[in-house]
């Protein structure tokens, strides 16, 4: 009766092994099944090709140098290398285990040290577990998906670091362009100051005009110091990204390129998310955990292994080589007797899988929001640039009128300088918007992942 119950238990568990844990078949979770096992070999080339829309060779060169020298990327590549080695190691588990040994033993007397006996022995042992239920294959697939997830993590790191490097590059370019405007205004104020001082000595201008022009010069110099400090901070951050290599001053002296609209693909449907490395990594991690769940279940099933032993033992070396013995042994193990010990492990595996499902859904939802937010940001900045551009035209005309009125003595120097200051503030505001526009476009382009357009 006990034997019948045992056999029945085996069949019940074998049947359960083919019932995989249920999964929510929502639209978002179904994306995880579409993730590719083929990871792009040269993601840096795809990223650099996407940067061509900015028509900035210095930017492309900088990003390429960051890819070559950044320590975080080097560390990520080492993690990927480690994952590949672990996967190759796990594949070997599907092969038979082979071991061999050679022994020589001698027995001698303690006092007389004469030889009592000598024994030679050798053996070869081959052990192979037959993967009846696919447990070893599931473990191998789990390790493969972990390797794929690590590869996608590496690509995601490349996108993040590329965006960060571009951000610092444009910050430095923006500051250089703004400094150029301040230096131009400083030259104008210096010329105005010389004129005011000569007219003050001649009694034409009052001391108030002298104080006004000196105060304006001090404000400009203060703004220059502030921008130079910001530039130094951005330079230091960029130097860290480059790992202090290829410190070309060309990057630090670049100016913001002239504004031009960027033509990009604005498609942000859910299918495009499959090109995002962070989404692909989350999907691969989920699939890895799924295979882990299956393999944990299958640990409860019987295992069947074959063992082949070839050995020989004799006092003569020639006998060891000429008269070996072989043994063939089969073994069936019933690990399901440890059900109560394994039960918690199964529950933990299920809970982890549910956690990874939630992580995947959250990443997909966040990615959708990012694409929409970046697209909205681009549209808002574009409209703002048009508005500021119109304002600049009006202020330039106003400044020309006020200059004529100041020279005619109709308005004070303070009023004229205020109009001039307003124009240059708006000009720097325009440059800031252009910088924000380029960076918003870059974020949108990289948020679309590594799709090749």
Label each PLM-derived region with a short phrase.
Residues 74, 94-117, 127-156, 160, ...:
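Small/polar (Gly/Ser/Thr/Ala-rich) solvent-exposed segments
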Residues 120-126, 268, 326-332:
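Hydrophobic, lipid-facing positions within transmembrane beta-strands of outer-membrane proteins
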Residues 13-15:
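C-terminal motif of bacterial Sec signal peptides marking the signal peptidase cleavage site
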Residues 246-248, 260, 429-453:
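Acidic, low-complexity, intrinsically disordered peripheral segments
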Residues 17, 136, 145, 151-268, ...:
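Periplasmic alpha-helical coiled-coil/stalk elements that build and connect Gram-negative outer-membrane
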Residues 2-9:
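Sec-dependent signal peptide recognition
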Residues 200-204, 406-410, 447:
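A short glycine-centered flexible hinge/capping loop motif at secondary-structure junctions
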Residues 17-88, 253, 257-287, 364:
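Bacterial Sec-pathway N-terminal export signals of envelope proteins
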């Amino acid at each position: 009766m006990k034997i019948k119950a045992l056999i029945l238990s085996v069949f019940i568990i074998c049947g359960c092994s083919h019932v995989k844990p249920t999964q929510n078949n929502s639209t978002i979770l179904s994306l995880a099944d579409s993730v590719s096992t083929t990871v792009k070999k040269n993601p840096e080339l795809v990223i650099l090709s996407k940067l061509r829309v900015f028509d900035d060779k210095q930017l492309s060169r900088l990003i390429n140098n960051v890819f070559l020298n950044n320590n975080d990327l080097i560390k990520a590549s080492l993690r990927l290398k480690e994952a590949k080695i672990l996967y190759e190691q796990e594949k070997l588990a599907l092969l038979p285990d082979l071991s061999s040994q050679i022994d020589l033993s001698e027995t001698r007397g303690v006092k007389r040290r004469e030889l009592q006996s000598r024994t030679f022995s050798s053996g070869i042992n081959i052990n192979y577990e037959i993967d009846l239920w696919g447990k070893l294959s599931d473990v191998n697939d789990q390790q493969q998906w972990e390797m794929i997830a690590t590869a996608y993590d590496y690509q995601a790191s490349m996108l993040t670091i590329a965006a960060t490097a571009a951000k610092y590059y444009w910050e430095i370019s923006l500051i250089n362009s703004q400094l150029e405007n301040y230096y131009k205004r400083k030259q104008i104020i210096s010329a105005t100051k010389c004129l005011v001082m000569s007219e003050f000595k001649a009694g034409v201008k009052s001391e108030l005009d002298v104080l006004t022009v000196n105060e304006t010069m001090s404000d400009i110099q203060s703004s220059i110091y502030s921008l130079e400090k910001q530039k130094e901070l951005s330079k230091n951050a960029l130097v860290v990204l480059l790992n202090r290599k290829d410190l070309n001053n060309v990057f630090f002296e670049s100016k913001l390129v002239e504004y031009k609209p960027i033509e990009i693909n604005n498609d942000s449907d859910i299918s495009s998310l499959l090109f995002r490395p962070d989404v692909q990594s989350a999907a691969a991690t989920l699939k890895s955990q799924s295979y882990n769940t299956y393999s944990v279940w299958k640990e409860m099933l019987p295992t069947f292994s074959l063992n082949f032993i070839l050995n020989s033992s004799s006092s003569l070396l020639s006998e060891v080589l000429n008269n070996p013995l072989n043994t063939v042994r089969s073994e069936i193990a019933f690990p399901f007797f440890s059900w109560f010990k394994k039960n918690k492990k199964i529950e933990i595996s299920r809970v982890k899988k549910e956690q990874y499902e939630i992580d995947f859904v959250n990443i997909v939802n966040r990615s959708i929001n990012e694409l929409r937010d970046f697209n909205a940001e681009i549209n808002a900045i574009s409209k703002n640039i048009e508005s500021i551009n119109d304002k600049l035209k009006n202020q330039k005309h106003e400044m020309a009128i006020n200059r004529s009125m100041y020279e005619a003595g109709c308005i004070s120097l303070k009023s004229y300088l205020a109009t001039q200051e307003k124009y240059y503030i708006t000009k720097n505001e325009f440059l800031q918007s252009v910088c924000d526009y380029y960076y918003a476009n870059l974020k949108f382009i990289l948020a679309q992942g590594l799709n090749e357009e």
